[in-house]
Amino acid sequence: MKIKDLFKNSITAALVFVSLSTTAMATAWDDYKQRYLSAEGSIIDTGNNRISHTEGQSYGLLFSLYYDDQESFSKILNWTDKNLYNQEKGLYIWAYKRHENDPVTDKNNATDGDLMIAWVLIEAGKKWNNPEYRKKGEKLLSVIQNTLIVTFAKRPVLLPGLVSFLENSKVTINPSYYIYPALNGVNKHTYQKKWKQLSDEGKKLITAVEDRKVPITPDWITLDLNGKVYVSDKWPARSSYDAIRVPLYLYWEDENAPELAEWKKWFSSFSADSTPAYVDVISGEKANYNMSSGLLNVRKLVMGETVSEPVFTDKDDYYNASLSMLTYLAYKHAFSQK
């Protein structure tokens, strides 16, 4: 072999090695961005008419913070502020429906998105030594505290949104909006007891739900003036795609949380490949199809199995991919503060 050919082959081999090394270093966040993050900074819900919402934006901020991606963080935050921030309320409009003439006709907020954004901004301020992020998060927290945490039946309650959930005789609650690592994080940051009390009451609510054949958390619950907690009649009585985040957040804060016991018992009734996607907690009727990838990762987390960094396929829509990412961060107890 001539020296020239040997040199050429060596260069080719080196380039192949570099290419393979770069591919190996790609993270789940890199793949997630490619699949669900637009060039402008919106997270696209591929399973819901390609809308964007504060849930997705907050997840995008969280993931970019975890992977130390300041460029994506800034892009996502700028899009969220430009398109979803409600100056009058000081909160974020819950959804951007790009297929409609007015993408933000519904001005209501979704409190889980606001809470996650506030927490992540505060954590970003710490990690990247950016006081503007911290102040922005604290300002949003203040609005949440003053408008979305109410006392009802002598207990603090987190409203799912400003509009439609609080009535004279009852309040409707989404248990998955109690993001326990976030509540713990902001409690440690602010030293305000209200956040710890809210977290504690959230756990009491999910264990107090009456009239259930299946004792896991439903997607929506109702608290009445007498302090009775029951499955909301405004939605199907299911534990499904919302409620699956409850054990995820419980584990994230404390993998030994006693509230996980019923979830472990439920999951252990099925093999991983035959666990139903949802169950009606009143009737016991189960879905006729099984859990998809994101839900299965939550199951794996709760059952004490190792959770690896996710690898996505074309079958994974936005929500399944997001659940898988959240589960990985929960397994790592990312940003947790004991």
Question: Where do the language-model regions lie?
Answer:
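Bacterial N-terminal signal peptides that target proteins for export
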Residues: 2-11
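Bacterial N-terminal signal peptides
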Residues: 10-21
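Sec/Tat signal peptide C-region and signal peptidase I cleavage site
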Residues: 22-26
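Extended ligand-binding clefts on enzyme/binding-domain cores
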Residues: 27, 50-54, 112, 135-307, ...
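N-terminal carbohydrate-binding/catalytic regions of secreted carbohydrate-active enzymes
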Residues: 28-114, 312
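Short glycine/serine- and small hydrophobic-enriched flexible loop segments
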Residues: 61-66, 116-126, 181-185, 248-252, ...
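A generic secondary-structure signal for well-formed alpha-helical elements
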Residues: 68-71, 84, 125-128, 144, ...
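A generic, well-ordered mixed alpha/beta core segment in the N-terminal half of proteins
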Residues: 108-145
